[in-house]
Amino acid sequence: MQFFNFLLFYPVFMSIYWIVGSIYFYFTREIRYSLNKKPDINVDELEGITFLLACYNESDTIEDTLSNVLALKYEKKEIIIINDGSSDNTAELIYKIKENNDFIFVDLQENRGKANALNQGIKQASYDYVMCLDADTIVDQDAPYYMIENFKHDPKLGAVTGNPRIRNKSSILGKIQTIEYASLIGCIKRSQTLAGAVNTISGVFTLFKKSAVVDVGYWDTDMITEDIAVSWKLHLRGYRIKYEPLAMCWMLVPETLGGLWKQRVRWAQGGHEVLLRDFFSTMKTKRFPLYILMFEQIISILWVYIVLLYLGYLFITANFLDYTFMTYSFSIFLLSSFTMTFINVIQFTVALFIDSRYEKKNMAGLIFVSWYPTVYWIINAAVVLVAFPKALKRKKGGYATWSSPDRGNTQR
């Protein structure tokens, strides 16, 4: 029974941890700031920001994103676009926009991955702070002000990651991911910030201190997820990462099952690659928040394989004609379902209440309250089974290239 308790209550424990962390973060750090007023900053003392946009086959989105960044009213900005050997007409579109606008364009002829593209861009950055954006990102006007303000109070802050919102919500998958980001990912980021270490910045929207990125050796070109990899390099060098929910951007998410599956496998593989690379280095740090993050990843992987082994054992040894066995199994199933549903209701309600400050209409997502987090754990389990073997086979020293992403539709 104790073994079963671990299988059942590990997801429950993590959900409770995220709920408590989110509530505490909201009332101590978030609610006191107004969304309608940007931080009071003296323009003469304002730090400059270099905006880095790395793109590969982004002809459908690059014009909107580049136009948005050009229109930002942030007083001290520099824009660098890096085309990573696109095979479509992305480069031609950027050259056309450049005819009437002032920005730096780095046109790489060979696709060598996002990390390599960012490395090429940051080496040309003039300012001490670098904002990395994906090529489908639309940034709110006040977001850079909220993010840069954090660096004034913490000299060891290496990066501030923002609050990505979803633009394409017309499809069922788009709506579900909107609720996922609001209720699950937002909870996790808030809780991890309180604990002292955020597992990963958001690759779509993060402001870095340039000297910190240089100090850790830039982005890794051979890691499948450059954002997770650089996050842990920053942690291991003693830098902090902070989540800033007031700094919002708008992005596109996959709207096909194939695109979503490919994205989630890539995310999981990237996390596992970092786990395999940085485990022993993390153990030497004597930093408890990093221990929590590392063991959370390890236990999540072990949980998946143990669940599968346990279910396989039950199936092989089951006596389906035994009334006592069937009654016991059914009661366990009911207990599991009730416990997970009860915790899910609490987590969704709390998370969507907090998130309603940014998008009130997301409260309609309570329709998913009873089942989605359970599905989330099942999907993650399937993803781990595919991603972990891929991480074990990672080739060091090469280039982790990217393919054309599933951006869905562009409506907001």
Swiss-Prot record:
InterPro entries: Glyco_trans_2-like (IPR001173), Nucleotide-diphossugar_trans (IPR029044), PGA_PgaC/IcaA (IPR023853)
Segments passing through the bilayer: 6-28, 290-312, 332-354, 366-388
Main localization (coarse): membrane
Any one Gene Ontology molecular-function term assigned to this protein's record: acetylglucosaminyltransferase activity
GO biological process: cell adhesion involved in biofilm formation
EC number: 2.4.1.-
GO cellular component: plasma membrane
Major enzyme class: transferase
Keywords (A to Z) from UniProt: Cell membrane, Glycosyltransferase, Membrane, Transferase, Transmembrane, Transmembrane helix
Membrane topology summary: Multi-pass membrane protein
Subcellular localization, as worded in the UniProt entry: Cell membrane
Family note: Belongs to the glycosyltransferase 2 family.
Role, per record: N-acetylglucosaminyltransferase that catalyzes the polymerization of single monomer units of UDP-N-acetylglucosamine to produce the linear homomer poly-beta-1,6-N-acetyl-D-glucosamine (PNAG, also referred to as PIA), a biofilm adhesin polysaccharide. Requires IcaD for full activity.
NCBIfam families on file: PgaC_IcaA (TIGR03937)
Protein name per UniProt: Poly-beta-1,6-N-acetyl-D-glucosamine synthase
